[in-house]
Amino acid sequence: MPVIDIIFRVDEICKKYDKYDIDKHREIGASGDDAFSRLFTSIDSDIEAVLRKAELASTEKNRAAAVAMNAEVRRTKARLAEDVVKLQKLAVKKIKGLTREERESRCDLVIALADRLQAIPDGNEHGAKQANSDWGGASAPNKNIKFDMSEEDMDDGFFQQSEESSQFRQEYEMRRKKQDEGLDIISEGLDALKNLARDMNEELDKQVPLMEEMETKVDGATSDLKNTNVRLKKQLVQMRSSRNFCIDIILLCVILGIVSYIYNALN
């Protein structure tokens, strides 16, 4: 496979798994006051995508394909559940210029988002019921769920990762490690190609003076050959002229001899 195709495929893989880079999203979320809006928009679009996939899985006639699609839906839901937890932290965070009513409105948005996420069918009814009970039930009214708006910092153990999310994180780290190893191999190959190209350029630079010298010698030989041909042509013309003159003298003598013989014979 050409190196350029490998580079394009690596870029596509990096773009495909970029949204799973939790550290990157964490840095983006902490970079500005509008981190909540960005994360909310990202989660909302991901929920729409996973909902479409769940609908496809529900209409899939191939059982194996449906199971695989449901497994992917569950993994995505686990990842989005972690993002919802982050969104919840951002919702209760005090920001300059943000009123208490606006923070409460953000909390309501988080609750609605969590309800939408847990309502997505994933082929695991027991897991869905358990998840709904953990969130207070998908059908429970939002007013029964309260946020402690005075709690600014929460302990690290307040939010626990689920087993599925931990497995997905391990799988993601393993895939990213393999991709990094592949990228390192590609980088080494590119360095080798770069060194080879540099060596070829050096050899070509060394051959340039030799080629110029050869061209000079060929031009000199061509000029000498042309001059030799001109001189040879002149010699041939001169030889031909001298030979013709001698033949003419001989013929004239023969004719005069014949005429003299005839004249003497007649007398």
UniProtKB/Swiss-Prot annotation:
InterPro entries: Syntaxin, Syntaxin/epimorphin_CS, T_SNARE_dom
Keyword Transferase: no
TM stretches of this protein: 245-265
SS bond list: none
Any Gene Ontology biological process: intracellular protein transport
Cytoplasmic compartment spans: 1-244
Coiled-coil regions listed: 53-87
Pfam families (alphabetical): SNARE
Keywords from the UniProt entry: Coiled coil, Membrane, Protein transport, Transmembrane, Transmembrane helix, Transport
Principal place of residence: membrane
UniProt keyword Protein transport, yes or no: yes
Single GO molecular function: SNAP receptor activity
Domain named t-SNARE coiled-coil homology: residues: 173-235
Cellular component GO terms, alphabetical: membrane
Tissue: Expressed in root, leaf, stem, flower and silique.
PROSITE patterns for the chain: SYNTAXIN (PS00914), T_SNARE (PS50192)
CDD domains (alphabetical): SNARE_Qc
Family indicated by similarity: Belongs to the syntaxin family.
Quaternary state and interactors: Part of the t-SNARE complex.
Physiological role: Vesicle trafficking protein that functions in the secretory pathway.
Name of the protein this chain belongs to: Syntaxin-72
